[in-house]
Amino acid sequence: MTEVLTEPRSIRIKGRSFLAVVLSPDLPVDNWLERLDDLASRSAGFFLGRPVVLDVAELAISRDELKALIAELSSRNVSIMGLEGARPSMVERGMPPILKGGRPVSDVDVPKVEPESPPAEEKKKTGKATKASGKSDEIGETDSPQAMITAPQARSVVQSLLLREPVRSGQSVIFTEGDVTVIGSVASGAEIIAGGSIHIYGALRGRAMAGSVGNASARIFCRKMEAELLAIDGIYKMAEDMPPELLGKPVQLWLEDDVIKAEKMA
């Protein structure tokens, strides 16, 4: 009898990188959890099925306190895929692994450019990047165009994604390489996550997160502001916290000194 020998198939191991939300709690943790609950209550499903990294580098907590924090997040359906900034002594079997090597900032040179005009004539803009955190800041309104004079930054090669159809409830569009433009509306329960700016030529009723990989010069433009949640470079705010006169209006938003500013467009 003849034996046929075959080599076993090799196991293929590949590396991939994925976009994950990074939560950076601050002390006291109970107060931070209350703010997180407020975010979740006003933006249902925000954390559902989303990979989350817990950054504890700035927290002086023990292993038991870390386990309790992870349990609190788990009870809120926040699934922690890994820990960042944790000491090895803080982690035991059954806890999420320690992650290293995350890059909150894009490795693209960012030259300075002059500010651009509002969205109807506006061209693609984008820039540098950082991670999202769970803190919030006030949205300021301004009637003066001089409040926008801070020069945005742009990549030498700008990339963009153009969507010619409305984004329906439950859909998630993630494009970290540059700007996202939607020729239509974004429904409640839908979300747009862009590495650059977001341009919506319709009603924004879902979630819009610009500068998701740390582009502080990113902006959000929409023809009708009714958003569930807005974020630029990890600073988030609910649209209902905006001045009432801006709701339902064409609006642009940008980040200035870690505060989201908003202005009505003509």
UniProtKB/Swiss-Prot annotation:
Residues 109-124 have a biased composition (Basic and acidic residues). SUPFAM superfamilies: Cell-division inhibitor MinC, C-terminal domain. It comes from the Bacteria. Keywords: Cell cycle, Cell division, Septation. GO terms for biological process: cell morphogenesis; division septum assembly; regulation of cell division; regulation of cell septum assembly. Residues 98-146 are annotated as: Disordered. The keyword Cell cycle applies. InterPro entries: CAP/MinC_C, MinC, MinC_C_sf, MinC_N, Septum_form_inhib_MinC_C. Belongs to the MinC family. Interacts with MinD and FtsZ. Cell division inhibitor that blocks the formation of polar Z ring septums. Rapidly oscillates between the poles of the cell to destabilize FtsZ filaments that have formed before they mature into polar Z rings. Prevents FtsZ polymerization. This is Probable septum site-determining protein MinC. The gene is minC.
